[in-house]
Regions:
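N-terminal secretory signal peptides and thylakoid transit peptides that target proteins
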Residues: 2-20
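C-terminal segment of N-terminal export signals and the immediately downstream linker at the start
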Residues: 26-43
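Feature activates predominantly on carbohydrate-active enzymes
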Residues: 55-58, 62, 105-316, 330-334, ...
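Catalytic-core regions of glycoside hydrolase
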Residues: 64, 68-71, 76-78, 149-151, ...
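C-terminal non-catalytic alpha-helical accessory regions
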Residues: 495-764, 768-769
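Glycan-association/targeting regions that enable binding to alpha-glucans and other polysaccharides
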Residues: 779-923
């Protein structure tokens, strides 16, 4: 974070809003007639900074809310007579004892230490850190404990020491302005920003990204476009007097009688808010990042555009953008980073390098360090070198799981559709990202090169989870581990509700789209997702953090029902990431929205497919996984079953079994929670329960539909009558699960939950039922009209397959151990060993294969058979393969006569990395 100067004592107290020792000595700890003192050393170079003063204010207010006015002091001897002394200092307190704990602050950035002891004869807590951000986290930890406490200890009883350090260098939240109707209320609301930024800092996010120009994939078909090309909405640039924004419609899209220029007053109001937001972000020790995703100033094929930019030409465009950005950087000194989309969707044709060279002059000339974060799609060495030439820190932001949210690891491979091929290469606007760099679209591509001039940041795109409440601590911890995969910088999360109202689909009345006004929160809609932010923020900071960090919030909300509330949401939150990972009809969030799923037909030609970003024919069984290396499609799995082969991947049957387990656990927990009337009577508790029930319904639907798809594929291949009948039965079960869920949701959410203009991006669960019914009816007719084929051998195979698919998935159990390699020497073989044998002493002949690949999604996996001796398998990644610019990754497949099992595979919550990666190099 930026350098922060020590501020004078009087200013510090003013920022805290506290009284001095003399003025507050009479205010005591009411229950015992004793006082609490907060000691902040006046000359401490860390504790006496403005952001720490803000954090101390939070602690002061938390205690005040409990009826205690703490005494502020600058030295320990001013705290005499206290029942508790809280010392905020980067150096050891005077006249203090803290047991055997080291008398020194943490040394690594953003780390914190809270240790109990005694100061001036009183019980004491010492909060220490190596920098202001770590100190903020320590002080806010105490403030949060106080606010969530329900007894006289105020949550401040600490045994020993609390010591934490960040696992990820970047822990970011992005909030995008996509709708004039739905987003202006929060953009202009200063109280919203106070509360929202307080929450981000409390949950240990260290970066906030305000994104403009994020709502469209292309500068065409544009309607709602406020801030889409942001500069003229914010600043008046000298030398460009003719540049102005003309309003063509009302905010909801009704044409005006004549265009009206957006006023100087509105522009100044917009810019004043940007200055305010960036300053308030910095005041809490957060890095402020400004995202500018679109640099097009004209839209094509956009007759319904709400605005038009006048006064720019192709000749003045780049220089105008440079000069406008320079003004913004000068007037908003808290901007510490800029995020750019640099491929064709920005409106700048790929290969237009002079534009970016000109724009970057504003950054290199701003007089301070400003990070350049370039979106990875279409990135190439020319753009990387251009950014590095500015002398500024450079990051490349890769999508974590395409434009969706998968499980807590990085996909082991990309879909075949993302692999560059000559017949797929495009020219013109997307000559790079849809050409030889096609594999950069949805992942980390080939970014992990040794000696790179940039850092890698992952971005969790808002495709899978947008509208419903989600929060699984196990999954968040898994994402925390994978955010620094091979020493990446971390993760940026697109906030819940991202894209709400985009493409001119905004609807007044609140982004959460509830029917009941009691459930709406206006601009404070983030409060619905307070638990999501807490779980993800705290676990991105430290994946091993104590569960108390989120459970104390649950206890303050649900009381005795806290545990079952956590279990219900955690299991429900695994449904959609699992489906996204294992079965992806489109990588684009523009097309695929599994929360409100548009039905993909099982039966060929029963209805038009809503998706075409998937293998042909466009039916349910041919859809591949987002990770096709570890998950099989329905056709792939059924072919292996019918041919008597083995499939060394997780199957759709595995996925259905997991979904059934998660929904059963969530269902039981939410029923238990509902039985506690006091736990579900509040509006926020109703939000919790209803969203869990919707996700349970989705899980039941997909589990049954996957089984139906498997059975129908067997039927198509064999004509086996029973498989067809069971397919209809399972599809009927899926349909009933969806119908029941949708019917209840009709009483909770509006009929139009809008995330875009097309039917697939808006509407309600009830809207999707006719598509399901159409396909189910086609399946009934197909099965009823079929003739039993004469191939009895196929029928026998089908009978065995049907029996397998009608039960939960089962895998043989093995006792395995493997010590992952810590490093590799380029040019030398990387030897690995696996100790594996059947569990429970069973006698079974095993073989093992080693799968390996560079950490480069432009390459495919290789396989080598391992040598076995006494239950130990040995293999090696060849030296000529390790001699590369990339880290290496690997996993094992154990083979028996009738099965293939992955190792390490997944844990019970599907939240771990199912392979090993080695990025450190040795000589």
């Amino acid at each position: 974070m930026a350098h922060l100067n020590v501020i004078p004592r009087r200013q510090f107290l003013k920022l805290v809003g506290a009284t001095t020792v003399a003025g507050a000595a009479g205010r005591t700890y009411a229950s015992a007639g004793r006082k609490i003192s907060i000691v902040v050393h006046e000359a401490d170079p860390i504790a006496s900074t403005k952001p720490v003063a803000w954090a101390v204010k939070q602690l002061y207010q938390a205690l005040s809310e409990k009826g205690i006015a703490p005494v502020m002091a600058s030295r320990e001897n001013e705290a005499s007579g206290s029942s508790l002394v809280i010392v905020v200092s980067s150096t050891a307190p005077q006249s203090a004892t803290f047991g055997r704990s080291p008398q020194m602050a943490p040394q690594s950035i953003e780390s914190l230490r809270i240790v109990s002891g005694r100061v001036a004869g009183a019980e004491a807590l010492w909060v220490s850190a190596a920098d202001a951000r770590g100190m903020i986290y320590g002080v806010l930890e105490l403030a949060d404990r106080v606010r969530c406490s329900s007894d006289a200890s105020l949550g401040l009883r600490v045994t020993g020491a609390i010591e934490e350090s960040p696992a990820n260098r970047v822990r970011s939240v992005a909030r995008a302005f996509c709708s004039e109707v739905e987003d202006k209320p929060w953009y202009y609301d200063k109280q919203f920003w106070q509360d929202y930024l307080d929450m981000l800092a409390l949950n240990r996010f260290n970066r906030f990204n305000l994104a403009f120009g994020f709502g469209y994939d292309f500068p065409q078909g544009v309607t709602g476009d406020y801030f889409h090309f942001p500069y003229p909405y914010l600043v008046d640039v000298p030398g460009y007097a003719d540049v102005r924004v003309m309003q063509l419609t009302t905010p909801d899209g009704k044409p005006l009688p004549a265009p009206v220029q957006v006023s100087k007053e509105e522009r100044e109001k917009n810019f004043e808010m940007l200055r305010y937001i960036s300053a308030e972000t910095g005041a809490r020790g957060l890095q402020f990042q400004l995202g500018i995703w679109t640099h097009a100033y004209q839209w094509t094929r956009s007759p319904g555009a709400h605005h038009n930019i006048e006064g720019l030409t192709p000749e003045t465009h780049a220089a105008y953008c440079r000069d406008a950005l320079a003004i913004i950087l000068k007037e908003c000194p808290e901007i510490q980073g800029l995020t750019f989309r640099v491929h064709g969707e920005s409106g700048i044709p790929e290969g237009s390098y002079p534009f970016w060279e000109t724009l970057f002059e504003a950054i290199s000339g701003c007089g301070r360090s400003v990070e350049i974060d370039m979106h990875a799609k279409g990135i190439n060495q020319i753009m990387i070198d251009m950014a590095a030439k500015t002398g500024m820190p450079v990051k490349v932001g890769a999508k974590s799981w395409a434009e969706q949210m998968g499980l807590g690891y990085h996909q082991a491979d990309i879909r075949e559709l993302e692999i560059p091929r000559p017949d797929r290469n495009e020219s013109g606007l997307f000559s790079v990202s849809n050409g030889e760099r096609r594999f950069t679209r949805y992942g980390y591509a080939d970014l992990y090169q040794e000696g790179r001039k940039y850092d890698i940041l992952f971005r969790l795109w808002p495709g899978t989870q947008r509208h419903l409440l989600w929060g699984d601590p196990a999954m968040a911890a898994g994402y925390s581990e994978t955010a620094h995969f091979c020493n990446a910088a971390g993760l940026e999360i697109c906030e819940p509700l991202t894209f709400k109202g985009r493409e001119g689909s905004g609807i007044p009345g609140g982004r959460c789209a509830y029917l009941d006004e009691e459930l709406q929160r206006g601009p404070q809609d983030w409060k619905k997702f307070a638990y999501t932010y807490r779980v993800w923020g705290r676990l991105l900071y430290n994946p091993a953090t104590s569960p108390d960090a989120w459970q104390r919030q649950l206890s303050s909300r649900f009381g005795a029902g806290a545990s079952v509330a956590e279990t219900a949401l955690a299991n429900a939150s695994r449904v959609l990431p699992l489906i996204t990972t294992a079965h992806l009809p489109s990588a684009s969030n523009h097309s695929y929205w599994p929360e409100i799923y548009a039905n993909m037909p099982i039966v060929p030609d029963s209805e038009p497919s809503p998706y075409n970003d998937t293998p042909k024919p466009f039916i349910f069984s041919t859809v591949t996984a987002l990770d096709p290396q570890l998950f099989s499609s329905i056709t792939e799995y059924v072919s292996a079953l019918m041919d008597g082969g083995k499939c060394a991947k997780y199957s759709p049957l595995d996925v259905a079994t997991w979904l059934e387990g998660f929904t059963t656990a969530s269902d039981a927990a939410i029923s238990s929670l509902h039985s506690r009337a006091s736990a579900t009577s509040k509006p926020e508790s109703r939000q919790w329960e209803e969203d869990v029930l919707i996700q349970i319904g989705l899980g039941k639907f997909f589990a049954a539909k996957l089984r139906s798809g498997l059975l129908y594929e067997i039927y198509r291949k064999s004509g086996h009558p029973k498989s067809g009948q069971l397919a209809v039965s399972k599809y009927s079960e899926a349909r009933e699960a969806w119908a029941a869920m949708a019917q209840r949701a009709k009483g909770v959410y509006r009929s139009d939950i809008s995330y875009g203009r097309t039917p697939g991006r808006r509407g309600h669960w009830a809207d999707r039922l006719p598509g399901i019914d159409l396909d189910l009816d086609a399946m009934r007719k197909a099965v009823a009209a079929a003739q039993t084929p004469p191939d009895q051998a196929q029928l026998a195979k089908a009978e065995l397959a049907v029996k397998l698919i009608s039960e939960p998935a089962h895998h043989p159990a093995y006792d395995c151990s493997h010590t992952p390699a810590h490093s590799f020497a380029p040019g030398k073989p990387l030897s690995v060993e696996l100790d594996a044998r059947p569990a429970n002493g069973k006698h079974e002949k095993l073989s093992a294969d080693l799968y390996y690949r560079h950490v480069n999604q432009g390459e495919r996996w290789r396989t080598v058979s391992m040598h076995e001796a006494g239950g130990k398998f040995a293999g090696a990644i060849p030296g000529d393969y390790t001699n590369s610019l990339y880290p290496v990754q690997y996993y094992f497949v154990l083979n028996s006569d009738d099965s293939a099992t992955l190792y390490p595979g997944f844990n019970s919550t599907l939240s771990n990395q199912p392979y090993y990666a080695v990025w450190k190099r040795s000589s």
